[in-house]
Amino acid sequence: MNTVKSLQEINIAFINDKSPIIDLISNDLLNFGIDILFRSENTKDGLSQLSALKELPKVCIIDLDFYDKNVLAQLQELRTQYPTIKLIAHSDIDAEKAVKPLLEISFDGCLLIGSDADDFRKAIETVINGGRLF
């Protein structure tokens, strides 16, 4: 298995998340050497930004909005179009009913709201190196 030896080798994208908390976490991740290719406000915009890239991110961190009835269909579309991207959910819900659909879509991990930049860094390293985090 090829493991990532340096965080400078990692590029990510944030989808469906433009919060001030993610602003702070993004700055910390940049300080860790992780390159953030883009941040989008919703999944549709994220799909559009992904299609414009020459090099895809290794990881997409997606804030889950379960109030959007189309969220699971949009996530399935994302997985289908970009099967090589590692997907990490960012959610305030850790109930089985929320996590089970993510497993069915083949998400690689889940971080709860309140996770700090170090938690994000560890999750990114885990999924890049073939692990899963739930």
Task: Please state what every model-predicted region is.
Residues D108-L111, T126, G131:
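Conserved phosphoryl-transfer motifs of two-component systems
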Residues L102-D108:
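As written
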Residues C60, L87, C110-L111:
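Two-component signal transduction core modules
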Residues I22, T43-G46, K58-L78, A95:
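Conserved phosphotransfer microenvironments
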Residues I34-K44, Q49:
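Short hydrophobic/Thr-rich beta-strand motif most characteristic of the beta2 strand and flanking loop
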Residues Q8-P20, I25-L29, C60:
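Conserved acidic segment of CheY-like receiver
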Residues S115-I124, I128:
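C-terminal output helix
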